[in-house]
Amino acid sequence: MVFRIASSPYTHNQRQTSRIMLLVLIAALPGIAAQTWFFGWGTLFQIVLAAITALVAEAIVLRLRKQSVASHLQDYSALLTGLLLAVSIPPLAPWWMVVLGTGFAIIIAKQLYGGLGQNPFNPAMIGYVVLLISFPVQMTSWLPPYEIAATTPDMLDTLRMIFSGHTASGGDMTLLRIGIDGISQATPLDTFKTSLRAGHSVEQIMQYPIYSGALAGVGWQWVNLAWLVGGVFLLWQKAIRWHIPVSFLLTLALCAALGWLFSPATLASPQLHLLSGATMLGAFFILTDPVTASTTNRGRLIFGALAGVLVWLIRSFGGYPDGVAFAVLLANITVPLIDYYTRPRVYGHRKG
């Protein structure tokens, strides 16, 4: 079997690229607003740090490669990479983590391969996975949504936490993660996985404050719905195609429904999978990256379905509570194979 892969770059029209990237940035506003509302100012500060780091790192590498800095920065791809990484990490993560992750994403995962259009893996997810593997404690230290938080830091305390690790009164992350029940909180997916391992039943877990009166976790369901709104905007503007997000979400829902049907005492419900974690962010903003996703319609359906299966498997049986980043990167590996078998036949040419 011989793979015939068109030569890179795969993104040719800079004006079209800039327009798409700008639309994605605009579409991210509802998700950013929701995360800021439920988890505080840290989301915005992380975005600013990531954006500055992405632009500086991109400019330095472009200068070293003797390429035009201004024209490349105007495609907004560096900003988008920084944004996607920033909204994926905890809002109060130390400043150096977002700088390190964004720098790695731009320099190693993007520019080392030749820049936009030539990277085989999603740069933001490469940066995220590097941080998650290297600093698992910090990367899983999410604040509880303000509705169930015992203490909510203001803007200045948020800055102090990001740059020094303490609030003005001496509080630290351990204190800020305590909920109204006096117990340290985690994300709905993390809570579900760790509680099951501790021997708690699903019925007991669903009584925790993080799930109180919510389909998929207080705050998180609204965050996911906000990213869904942005995704619908992208579909309306034809900035992305429907194949990947639809196949991803349907496959994830199907796997979750079957698992829940046969083992409701140990596996999460479909609504928890669909409306918690990075599900909608991944479906519409990460998996749809035109550079690292499949390029044919049939291939996009397969690519999205594969990612959906992987997310469910990692969440249900893996060591990490979410799994979207790992699923994206594993699916990226299969793109050349998927495209090889799904590329339409060109009539008038015989197979070599």
From Swiss-Prot:
Protein name as annotated: Ion-translocating oxidoreductase complex subunit D
Cofactor: FMN
EC main group: translocase
Protein's UniProt keywords contain DNA-binding: no
Sites of FMN phosphoryl threonine modification: 187
UniProt record similarity statement: Belongs to the NqrB/RnfD family.
GO cellular component: plasma membrane
Stretch forming the signal peptide: none
Domain of life: Bacteria
Catalytic activity, EC: 7.-.-.-
Subcellular location: Cell inner membrane
Pfam families: NQR2_RnfD_RnfE (PF03116)
Quaternary state and interactors: The complex is composed of six subunits: RsxA, RsxB, RsxC, RsxD, RsxE and RsxG.
Function: Part of a membrane-bound complex that couples electron transfer with translocation of ions across the membrane. Required to maintain the reduced state of SoxR.
GO biological process: electron transport chain; transmembrane transport
InterPro entries registered for this protein in UniProt: NqrB/RnfD (IPR004338), RnfD_bac (IPR011303)
Annotated source species: Salmonella paratyphi B (strain ATCC BAA-1250 / SPB7)
Membrane-traversing stretches: 20-40, 42-62, 69-91, 123-143, 215-235, 242-262, 267-287, 301-321, 322-342
Taxonomic placement: Bacteria, Pseudomonadati, Pseudomonadota, Gammaproteobacteria, Enterobacterales
